[in-house]
Amino acid sequence: MNTEFKKIKIAVIGTGTAGCLQTLQFSQELNFEYFELDWIYDPETPIFGIGEATTPHIPQVLRRSKFSTDMLFNELKGSLKYGVRFFNWGKKNKRFEHDFGVGQYGIHMDTSALSTFTLKHIENIEGTNIKVVAEKVKSIESSPNGCIVNGRNYNFVVDCSGYEPLLYKDEYIDSEIPTVDSAVIYRRMKPGKWNHTVHFAHENGWMFGIPLRDRQTWGYTFSSKFTTEEEAREGLQKLMPDEDVSTARYVTWKPRFASFLIDDNGVYARNGNAAGFMEPLQSLSGLHTEQITSIICDYVNDDCSKQLGNEAIIASEREWLEGLAYHYQMGSAFDSPFWNDVAERAKEFLKSKQCSEKDIEDIEKENPKDIERLALGCFACHDLLQLSHGLDTPTKDILGKWKFADFNSYGTDELWGAQDSIEDYLK
């Protein structure tokens, strides 16, 4: 990196989840004797706090930043997340759980509250040199000597500005497996009293349910290839007949990945939605963001080259895609155009992956102990076992021989609650 300034100057742009996580991670990993950090955001640009769920990786970032459980519950309006409950995924089981395991939990949080609290908290972290800059980014340039943002020079910039990045707007790769690309999102103003994320398959896609302390967020996701916004709103109303969902917000996105993480000049990177977005299934977007955050920290600390960083992000993107395909391969309880199309695409995509039925059979014959190291994308063996049983994949019996003989005890009603339908969650 170019270090012509007295201190290495870094800017993070944006205060969404990615901007918060990147700034918090920098606060932990940079030696501020040598770095200065500006966190730039436009106070006139609202953050749409839909309610967000995470994997177990994100709470570790918050813990290292001295966030307490009390802050999580009170400041972020959050709740603990022990896993994901699936309804109507696959052809066999009406309901199954993906449990994170003993001592592992994600969180549900209000994304706008995370932004507000982190902005207030960040400048008070001891031993840092972080300045919050409240202004709209009107100009940005990248060159071999650094970035210029609104006339100020920086050695490195992380763009967390959202779906529309500030530079390289066309440098993306379209998804190989188009799944859902739109959602109608409804806030139900009653506390969510459960500790898992809900993934409820419907004929046009699937719906997520996220519990916060003061409300619930329900998102009816669908593919614009098969379903219109009006049809999606009708579908949401059908699933929630006693709610007035007319206030539900419509959002859409193009499933895609960034073609690189760090630009050719080595001075600009993207994170969060600016680095690409597939869909919200299993909170994998948050995991992808956390991985990018770590790679960028390694890069600015000279622990990772530009080439390795870019290779790592491509690998992370492939893992995300593989994880999605594994969920969709068995279809759902619905014989509909969307599910038939996406299941066929997912099966075809997975034929070349390590978790294919033939590959697992080969591992079992040649070296059974390798089953323990089997993984697909971001899912380890114990995750695959739960998903394979719940989805009833062809590999479930082989996987089941090697781990979690007491699998059926996972996700007991005593821990998870006995909700058996959307109606049970809305009581």
Put a short name on every predicted segment.
Residues 5, 90-148:
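Conserved N-terminal helical subregion
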